[in-house]
């Protein structure tokens, strides 16, 4: 299946809708392979697809327990969650929507870098925060490095304002 041409919808606690087909959480490895084809790469019970932009994690009994998109804002795979484009939506807006659907405890112990929504088993991650970019700009300016129009600064600013990964797991996946 060409993942980049099918609409991809994360359905928390249920699975991944690929066009009109569903890859359910708790699917067997055989079911996953029948839908997606053979994985491009394996690391133990982790299967990777689409040049490592999609990861499937299987438990010890060979059942799908976690689905994660790893491509971020510039990736070819652009999933939706609750009708929002997960990587194109601003980080704060997505957090608000996930919090609303979660209606319960959120693990925000990573201080803005990641959140785990315990009731809906959704996790998001980014490697850089807006305040990190501001600190980088201040440091560059102190060292006489131009920041206005600097492509590295602009790239980091875009990355800080969006999520780099989003994943869904079986109920209770996040403790």
Question: Which residues does each predicted region cover?
Answer:
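Short helix/turn-capping signatures at newly exposed starts of structured segments
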Residues: 1-175
